[in-house]
Amino acid sequence: VALLKRAQALGFPVAPTWVVDLEEEFFRLNNLEERLEALFRGVFGVRIDEERLLLASEEAVRAVRESYLLPERAEAFLEVLKGKGPFLLRYAGEGALERARTPREALFALKRLYSERFRVEAVLQRHPRLIPPFTPVLVQEAEEAAEDPFLSLDLSRALGREVVVFAHQGLLVRVESPYGG
């Protein structure tokens, strides 16, 4: 987010971007932390119980997807994005993304992002921590983001350090280090 803001301040065109910081509230109001910890209880002992891990992960993904945002939060989300689209959604600082054509699809994509953090690979990567740090999600009005070598060169010069720019129709969508992240 900081690099996108800096690029915009330097006069580079940035895709319309909304920062959605609802994950902590979503988890708290749906009692997800306790529910998910209960699902994974007994999975990680001296050895990882792979069968229980698979079942717990499946149930965790389902629990997150079936949980609700506060109605007023969902309505505000839809209202802000009304008449806009398509969208790319991703966690700030991460490259993996979800696509959505409409605001309603973007709302479902937001919950998919939340639930993906409980797939087996993601859980194992974070172990021993089950609940990931709550991170804002960027919702960007763009259809696709591809590496743009010309914008990368221009922004690298302006910032005084090497960066890689991903853009959609000349608008910056993501800026990252050439070494990842």
State what each model feature region is.
Residues 8-11, 162, 170-172:
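Low-complexity, intrinsically disordered short peptide segments enriched in small/polar/basic residues
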Residues 87-91, 162-168:
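Short, hydrophobic/proline-enriched secondary-structure or compact coil segments at domain edges
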Residues 167-181:
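Conserved catalytic alpha/beta cores of large enzymes that bind or transform nucleotide phosphates
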Residues 1-147, 152:
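N-terminal beta-alpha lobe that positions the nucleotide/phosphoryl donor
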Residues 147-164:
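Conserved, well-ordered active-site substructure
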